Amino acid sequence: MIEIVYKENKEQANGNEGYFHLPKNIRQVGDTNGRERIYLEDYVGTFLKKYFSAPEGRAAMLFGEFKWADGISYFFIRSAAAIHTMEPAPDHLVFDDAVWTEVHDVMEKYFKNQQILGWALSLPGYGEDLNEQIIRAHLNHFGGNDKTLFRVNGQEKEETFYTYEGGTLRSTGGFYIYYEKNEPMQSYLIDQNQNRSCLLYTSPSPRD
């Protein structure tokens, strides 16, 4: 996997949702396809890695902000939350009322000013393929170009984002990790009694 560390100057992009700033300190992971730019906040990425280190299947919800400018989709994933009411398996991915109640309760408490950007899924031992169940679950509950699926696959814990294109899900190729204080995510982690190494994680780049 290719990792490139650099600083990106603050920019403004003008799209149909107005002006917005791009993160300043970022780390590129893999090669992006140019049509989507996915920015994953570092606390979120660290939380997902730890949460998905379990041997059983697990799912999480992704929150943040979606923007569109100059033909490019921008996903700013600022938060994530474990879905405790779901026990995912390759042939069993159910988003029932209990799941959505849990998700909206978490949003109301921690991430009130953010939107659902998609979901994250780990199925240890299953492999990297997206089966019919995974694709159907995404299209039924996260349809549209403003939602994404984050997969953590295999023993190597390969991380891949997927977005909707041509009637199915396709890999975005790569993504960006960015750094900020992210108090809402820290508050969620503290209340969830996460590992201290996750809470006190210090990145090599400064958080503004």
Residues of each region from the PLM?
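Histidine-centered catalytic micro-motifs
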Residues: L117-Y126
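Conserved beta-strand-loop surface patch within small alpha/beta domains used
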Residues: M1-Q115, E128-L199
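Conserved small/polar residues in nucleotide/adenosyl-binding loops
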Residues: Y201-D208
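Residues immediately flanking
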Residues: S122, G154, P206
